[in-house]
Amino acid sequence: MDPNMNNLLKWSIENSTSARQAADSNDAAPAPTSRSNLNPEMLSALFGGPSDADLMKAAMEALHSDEVDLENKMIAFDNFEQLIESIDNANNLEPLGLWTPLVELLKHEEAEMRRMAAWCIGTAVQNNEKAQDKLIVFNVLPTLVAMSTSDPAPAARKKAVYAISSGVRNYQPAMDEFVKHLPEGYTSGEKIDAADMDAIDALLDKLRAHPSEVSA
C-alpha cells in the first residue's frame, strides 16, 4: 500500500475508534484524542486537496490488503460508506477506478465483507441515476441477484436486496436488466415499470422470502 494512503487510513481508523470510544463511555471526563504525526504531504492530502477522494482510495486499498485485519477493514468500509453518501463522491467512484474493486468484494470469502460491499453499492446508487447506470456498465445486477438468493449469510442477502432496491427504482434500464436475471417464475413476462413502487416492492419481497440454496 502507498505510504501516504496507509497513513491516511491509520489516521481515519484512529479517529473513528476514538470517536466510538467517546460515544460508548459513561465517564464525564473527555476521552483522550488520538493524534497521529501528520506530515506535510498528509496534511495537504487531507486539507489542501481532494481529501474525500484520497480517503476513498485509501479505504479501498485497505479492503484489498492482506496486511489489514478484518476489524480494521470493517472500519475502512464504514468510513467508505459514509463518504459515498455524498452524490459527488458516489459519482467519483468511476473516475477513481473504484467500482471494479468494490464489485469484486461482493464475492469475498468473508460474509461481512460481502455484506458491506452490497451496502456500499446500495448507498452509492440510491436516488442517483448516474451511479445506477454503473450497475449495468459493471454487470453488477447478476451478482446481486445471485447473492440475494444463494448467499449463506442472511445479513449479506439482505444487503444485496437493499442494493437492488436502490439501484432499480426510477431507473428503467437497471430495472429491465434486473428482471432478466431473476429466478424463473418471478415475473409473468410483462415489463415492470421502474416507477411502480408497489410492483417493485412485491418483487423484492419475493427475493427476501427466497429460500437460500446454501445453509447458513
From Swiss-Prot:
It comes from the Eukaryota. SUPFAM superfamilies: ARM repeat (SSF48371). One of its GO terms (molecular function) is adenyl-nucleotide exchange factor activity. Gene3D superfamilies: Leucine-rich Repeat Variant. GO terms for cellular component: cytosol; endoplasmic reticulum. Residues 19-39 are annotated as: Disordered. Belongs to the FES1 family. This is Hsp70 nucleotide exchange factor fes1. The gene is fes1.
